Amino acid sequence: MKEKEFQSKPLLTKREREVFELLVQDKTTKEIASELFISEKTVRNHISNAMQKLGVKGRSQAVVELLRMGELEL
């Protein structure tokens, strides 16, 4: 088997990761939406989807968990 077949799928989508990278820079939902050229609702959806994947109930918990897992850096 090829090495690529053994690589696990990333936990976050590319866009979810972009949102959280901006979130840890202390950007607001509005600022993130503006920077990524998406709506504030879409930003909230990306955050919510990531929170569901992580099994956490808040943005702060999601950030802490992503940092702990090495999925996000400060």
UniProtKB/Swiss-Prot annotation:
Name the DNA-binding segment ranges.
29-48
Q: Which residues form the HTH luxR-type domain?
A: 5-70
Which CDD domains does the record cross-reference, listed alphabetically?
LuxR_C_like
Q: Which PROSITE patterns match?
A: HTH_LUXR_1, HTH_LUXR_2
Signal peptide (from-to)? none
Keyword Transcription among record annotations? yes
| Example of a GO biological process term | regulation of DNA-templated transcription
Q: Which residues cross the membrane?
A: none
Q: Name one GO molecular function term.
A: DNA binding
Q: Which Gene3D superfamilies match?
A: Winged helix-like DNA-binding domain superfamily/Winged helix DNA-binding domain (1.10.10.10)
Q: What keywords were assigned to this record? A: DNA-binding, Germination, Transcription, Transcription regulation
Report the protein's function. Involved in the regulation of spore formation. Directs the transcription of several genes that encode structural components of the protein coat that encases the mature spore (CotB, CotC, CotG, CotS, CotV, CotW, CotX, CotY and CotZ). Also controls the cgeAB and cgeCDE operons.
Q: What is the protein's given name? A: Spore germination protein GerE
Q: Which organism is it from?
A: Bacillus subtilis (strain 168)
